[in-house]
């Protein structure tokens, strides 16, 4: 009996085949809409005095920063073809170098986090200076963390629809049509294929093996699990503004770091730190570290620094208010 699952033949990157609207693009549109509505809902629920027009300017800068940061990280860090260095306009355009429409093919969330902070910071110190958006910026980062995590899984579902970001070989896994096939002469490949019910003829040089659906696992933990922790646990123990955003960054980085062990390293990068070269299908080392894990460790440290800094800001405000009350 076959011990694997075939990738659904009816699932395609396009929502409707022949029409250049992809699940990936649709997922981002939905995540933006969910975040926009959910952040505004929290503002109203907590009676935070922010004008709608100021909020919309803030959200525009946040979305723009997240997209720019995500695209820059994806194209300049993960892509090693050099095409974006020689054709930098392709970073921001949904076309290839021959001007064929492709849509945006890649966003790196680590860069998205950075852009989602830098762009609004610039905006609140220019366009929105001396507004309540500037006053409540840290509170808005908390709201944004909760809102974004609630819709995050949609992006990973789109990755699954694209049959990308799949995991390592596993019995009972899914055979992704776009997965990198294995040379049948690699030690352990023929034995593994036989154990899951895949036949290899004497003339087969390559074979596609079942893999872990790591994009779905990432989506579950970095999306719903993180959202529930933020909404039902950390929101209740929050002591100061900015705390939830720092926790969110650390939670995301924590889950991402460990789930990366299940994920196939990026083909062009491989392992950034290779403690033990992989020469057979069964070999594995926790000390082989991918780019995603390095960036996740950096993100985790950034989240911790954010928590420490925002705690000092909160303590300073309390001290100033206490001194002011004492003088009065």
Swiss-Prot record:
Membrane topology category: Multi-pass membrane protein
UniProt pathway: Protein modification; lipoprotein biosynthesis (diacylglyceryl transfer)
Record InterPro entries: Lgt
GO CC term (a single one): plasma membrane
Residues annotated as transmembrane: 15-35, 57-77, 106-126, 242-262, 289-309
Pfam family, one: LGT
Residues reported to bind a 1,2-diacyl-sn-glycero-3-phospho-(1'-sn-glycerol): 156
EC number of the protein: 2.5.1.145
Broad class of where this protein is predominantly found: membrane
Lineage: superkingdom: Bacteria
A molecular function (GO) term: phosphatidylglycerol-prolipoprotein diacylglyceryl transferase activity
Cell membrane in keyword set: yes
Record's subcellular location: Cell inner membrane
Sorted UniProt keywords: Cell inner membrane, Cell membrane, Membrane, Transferase, Transmembrane, Transmembrane helix
Keyword Zinc-finger belongs to the record: no
Gene Ontology biological process terms, A to Z: lipoprotein biosynthetic process
Enzyme superclass (EC): transferase
Biological role: Catalyzes the transfer of the diacylglyceryl group from phosphatidylglycerol to the sulfhydryl group of the N-terminal cysteine of a prolipoprotein, the first step in the formation of mature lipoproteins.
Family membership: Belongs to the Lgt family.
The name this protein goes by in its record: Phosphatidylglycerol--prolipoprotein diacylglyceryl transferase
Protein source organism: Borreliella burgdorferi (strain ZS7)
């Amino acid at each position: 009996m076959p011990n694997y699952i075939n990738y659904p033949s009816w699932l395609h990157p396009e929502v409707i085949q022949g029409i250049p609207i992809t699940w990936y693009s649709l997922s981002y549109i939905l995540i933006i809409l969910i975040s926009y509505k959910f952040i505004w809902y929290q503002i109203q629920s907590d009676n935070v005095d922010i004008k709608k027009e100021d909020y919309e300017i803030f959200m525009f800068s946040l979305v723009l920063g997240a997209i720019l940061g995500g695209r820059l990280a994806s194209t300049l860090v993960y892509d090693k073809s050099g095409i974006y260095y020689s054709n930098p306009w392709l970073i921001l355009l949904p076309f290839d170098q021959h001007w064929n429409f492709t849509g945006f093919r890649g966003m790196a969330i680590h860069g998205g986090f950075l852009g989602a902070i830098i762009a609004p910071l610039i905006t609140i110190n220019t366009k929105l200076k001396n507004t309540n958006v500037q006053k409540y910026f840290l509170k808005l980062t908390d709201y944004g963390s909760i809102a974004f995590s609630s819709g995050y899984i949609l992006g990973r579902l789109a990755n699954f629809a694209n049959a990308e970001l799949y995991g390592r070989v596993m019995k009972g896994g899914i055979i992704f049509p776009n997965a990198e096939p294995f040379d049948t002469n690699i030690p352990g490949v023929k034995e593994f294929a036989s154990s899951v019910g895949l036949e290899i003829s004497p003339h087969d040089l390559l074979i596609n093996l079942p893999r872990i659906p790591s994009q779905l696992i990432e989506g579950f933990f970095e999306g719903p699990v993180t959202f529930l922790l933020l909404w039902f646990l950390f929101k209740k123990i929050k002591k100061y503004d900015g705390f939830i955003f720092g926790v969110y960054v650390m939670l995301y980085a924590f889950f991402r770091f460990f789930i990366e062990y299940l994920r196939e390293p990026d083909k062009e990068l491989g392992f950034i730190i290779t403690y033990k070269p992989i020469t057979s299908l069964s070999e594995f080392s926790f000390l082989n570290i991918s780019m995603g894990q390095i960036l996740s460790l950096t993100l985790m440290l950034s989240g911790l620094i954010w928590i420490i800094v925002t705690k000092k800001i909160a303590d300073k405000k309390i001290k100033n208010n206490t001194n002011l009350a004492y003088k009065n």
